[in-house]
Structures are given as structure tokens and as C-alpha cells.
């Protein structure tokens, strides 16, 4: 586990910049999955450099259900903003399927950015999606 990145002036780097550095580094980057702000703080206290949050953990934490597009974009971005407020660590967050078409994906990126999320990942399933480890999934055509 590496120490927090600093700019040339000694100031802490933006979380987005820090995540890019961590990903580009030759060392293996371990991102513990967190389900709430406390988990993010515990990961920070344990010395991790970044955290990740997935849709299954979010849906199970908030609703006690599997990840099947039951949480809205605003519910997830609000939840992730709490993680980001609780820790200096960069957060790589699940953006589900982007919550619809290309316009929705662009909106998701903007809301996640406002929430303080350093990076996001998007599934290739059609919307609404099915839980990733359950049968009956359909993926978006490559042309789309």
C-alpha cells in the first residue's frame, strides 16, 4: 500500500488524479469493496489507497435485495457522495448500466463527478439489467 499522492507543491492530489496514478503504477492495486461510509473509513484506516463500491453491495445494503436495477441514479450517487465525504480515498464506483441510453450515461457521469467519485465502471447489460450472477442476462449490441 502506497502513501497518498501529492502535487509538486505538496498539496493532496485530486481523487481522480490519484486514482489514475494508482491504476498506472506497476504494482497490483487492491481495492476493497465497501458498502457504506464506515467501510470506506475502515479501509482508509487499514492503509488501502482506494476503494470500490458495487451495485450489489449498494442494493443489498439499502434494500436487502439483489442487484437488478432497483436503485436509481440519484440514490446511488447520493450513497457514493457519503463515501467520498467520509474519506480521502478515491472511489471507483459501479454505474450499473448507465441508467438508460447515451444521454443517461452522460448524466450519470456528471452526477457521479459531483458526488466526488474518482472513477466509474459500466456494465454491458441492457437496461433494466439482471443481477450479474443470475441467469437471463442480455448484453447491449456492440454497435450501440
What residues fall within each predicted segment?
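Alpha-helix-loop-beta-strand connector modules within alpha/beta enzyme cores
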Residues: 14-17, 65-93, 115, 133-144
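N-terminal glycine-rich anion-binding loops that anchor highly charged ligand groups
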Residues: 41-60
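Short, small-residue-enriched loops and turns at beta-alpha junctions
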Residues: 40, 68-70, 97-101, 127-128
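N-terminal amphipathic alpha-helix/helix-capping segment at the start of soluble metabolic enzymes
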Residues: 2-33, 41-46
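Catalytic cores of alpha/beta
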Residues: 39-42, 99-111
